[in-house]
Curated annotation (Swiss-Prot):
Protein family according to the UniProt entry: Belongs to the anthranilate phosphoribosyltransferase family.
Necessary cofactors: Mg(2+)
Biological role: Catalyzes the transfer of the phosphoribosyl group of 5-phosphorylribose-1-pyrophosphate (PRPP) to anthranilate to yield N-(5'-phosphoribosyl)-anthranilate (PRA).
Pathway: Amino-acid biosynthesis; L-tryptophan biosynthesis; L-tryptophan from chorismate: step 2/5
UniProt GO BP: L-tryptophan biosynthetic process
Binding site for 5-phospho-alpha-D-ribose 1-diphosphate: 81, 84-85, 89, 91-94, 109-117, 121
Molecular function terms from GO: anthranilate phosphoribosyltransferase activity; magnesium ion binding
Protein name: Anthranilate phosphoribosyltransferase
Self-association state and partner proteins as the record states: Homodimer.
Alphabetical keyword list: Amino-acid biosynthesis, Aromatic amino acid biosynthesis, Glycosyltransferase, Magnesium, Metal-binding, Transferase, Tryptophan biosynthesis
Reaction catalysis annotation: N-(5-phospho-beta-D-ribosyl)anthranilate + diphosphate = 5-phospho-alpha-D-ribose 1-diphosphate + anthranilate
Encoding gene per record: trpD
């Protein structure tokens, strides 16, 4: 089956939803070889994925994944980027997730170790002693108690191990980079997603709309980040009430200072940890704090807590300045990890 579809892709012929869904059953069951998988993914990337193809893959990924059943009432969101911007910035969406949760949102964070950056969200949670292999019911409890949790992609998507060799061999972006952030195990209907390419800005909301999404915001900054940036204008696409709207967000217009990309870049895993804690306890540089606030603002709008960016940025900054964000981190680490690790960084 897969060899026929590889031939089709080589001829630049699009696959149907059903063809993709069927071949993904074989791929994620381990019935195909590493070289077939690499060939398939490479040719798919070269052809360019259609929405039907992406949806066929996404539905099958979710069918094969573990799930969590959140007990929280109200809007549950996720916020993350597709990664791969190679800009070596600090962990913006992870930091912003704690700000959103401290400001009254509920964030079911889904993430992984870093693929092309210095530190991924999993690296941060793990550093503070969070068990990446927690079972779904325990994670649902953590979410209910703290309004934030972390679901490790490798734990929740065990079938993805069948494509890990092929993805490493290829060493380039494939459809899975795009679909990872969309395959949240808590089945969230409200998401902020940073994208690595402008072409996906309006495509992802439309794909997620077909899956019953409610509020989706995608972002790409003009300086190349798959997150909101305070060093340039940000292109934003919003799905709300079944309508898709494009917008541009200028950081200075929403009350922030223009910064430079170098202000938020890091070089080591230690830098990543220190930046994460530094923002939440309000000791990091202005650019890191304001970049986090702008990304948290996107999350607060998606979570139906704020109506516009000006209001949301102010709420995010106040949540950091009045100590609520750091207080949540302390309680979270006390409950799920090793508080001495946090004290060491915070007091350092």
């Amino acid at each position: 089956m897969i060899s026929d579809l590889i031939s089709k892709l080589q001829e630049k012929t699009d696959l149907t939803y059903d063809e993709m869904n069927q071949v993904m059953t074989d791929v994620l069951s381990g019935k195909t070889t590493d070289s077939e998988n690499a060939d398939f993914l490479s040719n798919l990337t070269d052809k360019g994925e259609t929405d039907d193809e992406l949806l066929g893959m996404l539905d099958k990924m979710q069918e094969f994944s573990l799930k969590i059943e959140p007990k929280n009432t109200g809007t549950i969101i996720d916020m993350c980027g597709t990664g791969g911007d190679k800009l070596q910035t600090f962990n913006i969406s992870t930091t912003a997730s704690f700000v959103v949760a401290a400001a009254g949102g509920v964030v079911a964070k889904h993430g992984n170790r870093s693929s092309s950056g210095i530190s991924g969200s999993a690296d941060i949670f793990e550093y503070f002693g969070y068990d990446l292999n927690l079972e779904p019911p325990k994670i649902a409890e953590i979410l209910e108690k703290h309004n934030i949790c972390f679901m490790f992609a490798q734990k929740f998507h065990p079938a993805m191990k069948h494509v890990s060799v092929a993805r490493k061999q290829l060493g380039k972006r494939t459809a899975f980079n795009l679909l990872g952030p969309l395959s949240n195990p808590a089945k969230v209907k409200n998401q902020l997603v940073g994208v690595f390419s402008i072409e996906y800005l309006d495509r992802l909301p439309l794909i997620l709309k077909r899956k019953g999404a409610q509020n989706i915001m995608t972002v790409r900054s003009d300086d190349g980040m798959d997150e909101f940036s305070t060093s340039s204008t940000n292109r934003v696409c919003v799905l709300r009430d079944d309508k898709v709207l494009m917008n541009a967000i200028d950081p200075e217009v929403v009350g922030l200072h223009k910064s430079s990309l170098t202000d938020i870049q890091i070089q080591t895993k230690e830098d990543a940890i220190e930046s994460f804690v530094g923002v939440l306890n309000n000791t990091a540089n202005q650019a890191m704090i304001e970049t986090t606030a702008l990304n948290a603002a996107g999350g607060l709008i998606v979570a139906n807590i704020s109506n516009n960016f000006e209001e949301a940025v102010e709420l995010a900054l106040n949540t950091i300045k009045d100590g609520k964000a750091f207080s949540l981190l302390e309680k979270f680490v006390q409950d799920t990890g090793d508080i001495s690790k946090l004290k060491e960084i915070a007091d350092g």
